[in-house]
Swiss-Prot record:
Protein name: Transcription initiation factor IIB
Superkingdom of source: Archaea
One BP annotation, GO: transcription preinitiation complex assembly
The UniProt record lists the keyword Zinc-finger: yes
GO terms under cellular component: transcription preinitiation complex
Single GO MF annotation: zinc ion binding
Amino acid sequence: MSSSSPTSSGKPLKLRIDRDNEGYLSLVTDTGEVYRCPICGNDRFVYNYERGEIVCIVCGAVVQEQLLDLGPEWRAFTSEEKGQRARTGAPLTRLISEALTTVIDWRDKDVSGKELDIKRKLEVIRLRKWQTRARVQTSYERNFIQAAQELERLRSSMGVPRPCVEQALEIYRQALEKELVRGRSVEAMAAAALYMACRMMKMPRPLDELVRYTKASRREVARCYRLLLRELNVKVPISDPVLYISRIAEQLKLSGEVVKTAIEILQKAKKAGITAGKDPAGLAAAAVYIASLLHGDNRTQKDFAVAAGVTEVTVRNRYKELAKTLNIKVPVK
């Protein structure tokens, strides 16, 4: 993948995008030089799928934006090859291919909202029944489509990037093939698959936040997640608290200096060995809270707890641990 980025002279600079083993991006110029952030000099970046931007992991500066490739992924050198390789009508995502088409509404009303007469109601009921039969043939398909619809609902409610949802759908498919879904609710299994997918793609969401948007309980989702880990033999990277910082800062509209300070606090905490076994979202919220205080932004712990999807108690406890262990002199409000 390649794109262009403005330079100090105003001319576009062609960059090649590479990804390392940890999932971070590095940018290389057409001359083979490593591109560095013009603000802080860092050479590692992350991709924001929601905005189509490449962002510096240290200062939060956007170094590239509007990365949207509308061309085909294949190359053709003759008109015959182009005709053979061109295709139309293929699904854009797994969600669309899994029968997420329009359905006849369960409300017996017309387009203007008026109740249908009895004759039309009976006709709609009959059509609805035939549509269900035509779309779904087996219990496997019914279960899978129900999960796809639940994942699409979670994506819309939580603002989860679509690639995470597609990965979650693939995880659910594997669970369904191994009959892990039997005896468990579709909502809990779909939520667990989405939680796993977000972590796999280094865009983690707190479990407590996810549970708020599903009918399943936290205990049920956590149990299904452990089952998926054990039975599918999936390697899920340990959540880095740093990955939560940009989302918290974006919700609270914090400055790049606050983000940079929060990352430095977490890096020191890792070296001190106080991050192991702690909720990464809570650690990130506490680090951003401390960084905000150091930069004169006196918001409440509740603001940071809500943005991170954790409780105030968690933020307070992690804040005390970080400040005490790292000997940070936090200004009193």
